[in-house]
From Swiss-Prot:
Part of the 30S ribosomal subunit. Belongs to the universal ribosomal protein uS11 family. Residues 1-23 are annotated as: Disordered. The lineage of its organism: Eukaryota, Viridiplantae, Streptophyta, Embryophyta, Tracheophyta. It is found in: Plastid, Chloroplast. It comes from Nasturtium officinale. GO terms for cellular component: chloroplast; ribonucleoprotein complex; ribosome. Pfam families: Ribosomal_S11. Disulfide bonds: none annotated. Its main location: plastid. Keywords: Chloroplast, Plastid, Ribonucleoprotein, Ribosomal protein, RNA-binding, rRNA-binding. GO terms for biological process: translation. This is Small ribosomal subunit protein uS11c.
Length: 138
């Protein structure tokens, strides 16, 4: 009896349960990357494995609206809503970047009910490294 031919691109060959397994995570790390154009919020466990993430672009904001504080607040709320359902109570916050969404994202994180152990600014600062881009002339 001949074996059935498996299609390589079929979904039957993939593992289905490993994608959305619900782990109980009591403590995590919330990374906020706020640039002038977008804000990305990533929630990881203490070992650095990504649990949930969201950005202003995935929340439906396009163009210059992605860099606004309201877009950052919405992105932070979406990322945290998923991990609160998984049982996260405590978190550390690491904020990176000069964008407008820094404070708005932190405000949304505080309002979510997660206890914050500390808030750390991890923006990379050069010790006179590369030459910055030239000034804009509008």
């Amino acid at each position: 009896m001949a074996k059935p031919i498996l299609r390589i691109g079929s979904r039957k060959n993939t593992r289905s349960s490993s994608r959305k397994n619900v782990r109980r995570i009591p403590k995590g790390v919330i990374h906020v990357q706020a640039s002038f154009n977008n804000t990305i919020v990533t929630v990881t466990d203490v070992r650095g494995r990504v649990i949930s993430w969201s950005s202003a672009g995935t929340c439906g904001f396009r163009g210059t609206r992605r860099g606004t504080p309201f877009a950052a607040q919405t992105a932070a709320g979406n990322a945290i809503r998923a991990v609160v359902d998984q049982g996260m109570q405590r978190a550390e916050v690491r904020i990176k970047g000069p964008g407008l969404g820094r404070d708005a994202a932190l405000r949304a994180i505080r309002r979510s009910g997660i206890l914050l152990s500390f808030v750390r600014d991890v923006t990379p600062m050069p010790h006179n490294g590369c030459r910055p881009p030239k000034k804009r002339r509008v």
